[in-house]
């Protein structure tokens, strides 16, 4: 598991800049020296993870583990810490979410977090593709990494 206090703090702060307009997100990026790629700049849903992490560090003094969990909660990345995975998954399957497969994903998240990451990342990428939205490279890399881990695990249990 992970520290429940850290998870709670990350959960409270992870969307602290989400409601800001793109122009404000870009100003925060400039203020904190955040370099954004073209996919992030075109999508404030992704941009708020980076700016939120910086604001959480600067204004609330969160430790690096919480800052990183906030930073990666929208795209994911390969080899995430337990806290990073918990926040990513909690955000993806929160009670207000209603999409095909969310109930299965919620059950899986409580029993096998890495398997939930594989399924959640696949679902996210399929949803983006269906909507004609370019997925972030980190999300694709995360899925490839977790699928590789799944295959490694299968080899060790044969």
What are these regions (language model features)?
Residues 2-121:
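Divalent metal-dependent catalytic cores for phosphoryl transfer on phosphate-bearing substrates
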Residues 126-158:
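Charged phosphate-binding loop/patch that engages nucleotide di/tri-phosphates or the phosphate backbone
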